[in-house]
């Protein structure tokens, strides 16, 4: 059946333009009217006929010309062979015929390999995948790079083909190789906004911390190109997907990675990529996709899930095995509590002035860090709810926590004021004690300043939390 022509010219060199004159290669499925050779043709005319047969996808004529003695690896003006042209348009049947006739699957022209050409082809992923399977079955090397040091997996990631990426890795492709600009396959996927490819690469062990030559990580590249969901996911400290399939054999890897050919898996995984939130991504990484509906029915968000205890997980119908996976992930996500240091026992009345001063200084410094953290949150918080990229719980939950924070800060402020009054009282008593030898005034003044600064800092933190609370209420 005939199909319309592909309007662009096939260009050699991995998408780089050529200054050579037009070779007339409009690759595509043109008029597929059966043609037969009327008799022996001169060499030049035979090559021109061969080119037209390839252009039109006339497989029977291609086979007849090959039978007449024309070389299957005949190169044309750009130096491309017939196999490269067939791969560039993902003509699976033509690729199969040429390979069966002895075409060189490892051929390259200026480091542009047939496999790279197939990976960067314009066509459906299904056809591209089949062409690449054929080339890999003929020992095409998935790690040979082009002049820009881009490997086939980078082209597949750039063009958004997760199954092709998986197939290449199953045949030995290196996931973390870098091109001339320091881009990895993950960087390319993040740059182009291909979330499904990002997920697949992380599952295959891609390192999200590798930097480009200008010092950018994949998450920063995603942010720069306004792919905020990918940026948020890659910014998570935990990568539960990483290396998930490393322990499988080659056959198991191919089977597992390509099982998405079934309609059921496509519906469950690929169709849901467009609607993935942070909860789905987290569960997918742990292999707990089956829990998504359960958690959504119970209105449990990721942030709620991350704060649940083991008994709460059990009450919500989560099995022991799934609980273990979640708790292990939560353990990796735990944030270290701020440690102020331990004071000597006050009851012994042996606390030194230096130790007490160090405690106050440390407390004051930590309060300053907390104030800065809240200021950053207020600055970064989206002004409008429609700008929030990932799934959020009800703002009422956030407001409730802010209310508790304000209450705690008020309590802290009250206690610090009591401490200040107590120290002031002690200071006054010592000054009025005729037996006391007064210390240097500078020390007394310094202690007073520290106490005042601590009290002011705590009060300021309370005001900031109050502002934060009002901000959430407005949203």
UniProtKB/Swiss-Prot annotation:
It comes from the Eukaryota. PROSITE patterns: ANK_REP_REGION, ANK_REPEAT. Keywords: ANK repeat, Cytoplasm, Developmental protein, Differentiation, Meiosis, Phosphoprotein, Repeat, RNA-mediated gene silencing, Spermatogenesis. The modification Phosphoserine is found at residues 17-18, 20. Its main location: cytoplasm. ANK repeats lie at residues 45-74, 78-107, 110-144, 148-177, 181-210, 214-243. Residues 1-24 are annotated as: Disordered. Gene3D superfamilies: Ankyrin repeat-containing domain (1.25.40.20), Transcription Factor, Ets-1 (1.10.150.50). Transmembrane segments: none annotated. GO terms for biological process: cell differentiation; male meiotic nuclear division; regulatory ncRNA-mediated gene silencing; spermatogenesis; transposable element silencing. One of its GO terms (cellular component) is pi-body. Residues 272-334 form the SAM domain. It is found in: Cytoplasm. Plays a central role during spermatogenesis by repressing transposable elements and preventing their mobilization, which is essential for the germline integrity. Acts via the piRNA metabolic process, which mediates the repression of transposable elements during meiosis by forming complexes composed of piRNAs and Piwi proteins and governs the methylation and subsequent repression of transposons. Its association with pi-bodies suggests a participation in the primary piRNAs metabolic process. Interacts with DDX4, PIWIL1, RANBP9 and TDRD1. This is Ankyrin repeat, SAM and basic leucine zipper domain-containing protein 1. It comes from Ovis aries.
């Amino acid at each position: 059946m005939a199909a319309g022509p592909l309007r662009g010219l096939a260009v050699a060199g991995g998408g780089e333009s050529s200054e050579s004159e037009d070779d007339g290669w409009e690759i595509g499925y043109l008029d597929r009217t059966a043609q037969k050779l009327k008799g022996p043709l001169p060499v030049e005319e035979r090559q021109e006929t061969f080119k037209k047969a390839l252009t039109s996808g006339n497989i029977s004529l291609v086979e007849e010309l090959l039978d007449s003695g024309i070389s299957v690896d005949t190169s044309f003006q750009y130096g491309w062979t017939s196999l490269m042209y067939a791969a560039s348009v993902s003509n699976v049947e033509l690729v199969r015929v040429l390979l069966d006739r002895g075409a060189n699957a490892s051929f390259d022209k200026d480091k542009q390999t047939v496999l790279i050409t197939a990976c960067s082809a314009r066509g459906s992923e299904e056809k591209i995948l089949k062409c690449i399977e054929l080339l890999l079955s003929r020992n095409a090397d998935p790690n040979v790079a082009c002049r820009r040091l881009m490997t086939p997996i980078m082209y597949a990631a750039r063009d958004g083909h997760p199954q092709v990426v998986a197939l290449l890795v199953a045949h030995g492709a290196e996931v973390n190789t870098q091109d001339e600009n320091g881009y990895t396959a993950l960087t390319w996927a993040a740059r182009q906004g291909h979330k499904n490819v990002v997920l697949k690469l992380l599952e295959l062990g891609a390192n999200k911390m590798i930097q480009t030559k200008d010092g950018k990580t994949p998450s920063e590249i995603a942010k720069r190109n306004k792919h905020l969901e990918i940026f948020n996911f890659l910014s998570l400290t935990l990568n539960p997907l990483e290396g998930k399939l490393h322990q499988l054999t080659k056959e198991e890897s191919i089977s597992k990675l390509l099982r998405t050919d079934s309609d059921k898996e496509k519906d469950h995984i690929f169709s849901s990529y467009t609607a993935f939130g942070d909860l789905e991504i987290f569960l997918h990484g742990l292999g707990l996709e089956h829990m998504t509906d359960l958690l959504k029915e119970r209105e449990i968000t990721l942030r709620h899930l991350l704060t649940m205890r083991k008994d709460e997980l059990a009450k919500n119908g989560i099995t022991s095995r799934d609980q273990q996976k979640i708790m292990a992930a939560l353990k990796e996500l735990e944030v270290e509590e701020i440690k102020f240091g331990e004071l000597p026992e006050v009851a012994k009345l042996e606390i030194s002035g230096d130790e007490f001063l160090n405690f106050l200084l440390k407390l004051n410094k930590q309060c300053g860090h907390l104030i800065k953290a809240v200021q950053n949150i207020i600055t970064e918080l989206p002004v409008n709810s429609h700008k929030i990229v990932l799934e959020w719980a009800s703002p009422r939950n956030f407001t409730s926590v802010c209310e508790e924070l304000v209450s705690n800060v008020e309590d802290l402020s009250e206690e610090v004021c009591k401490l200040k009054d107590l120290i002031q009282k002690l200071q006054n008593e010592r000054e009025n004690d005729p037996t006391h030898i007064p210390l240097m005034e500078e020390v007394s003044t310094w202690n007073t300043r520290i106490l005042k600064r601590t009290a002011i800092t705590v009060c300021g933190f309370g005001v900031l939390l109050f502002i934060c609370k009002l901000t959430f209420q407005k949203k």
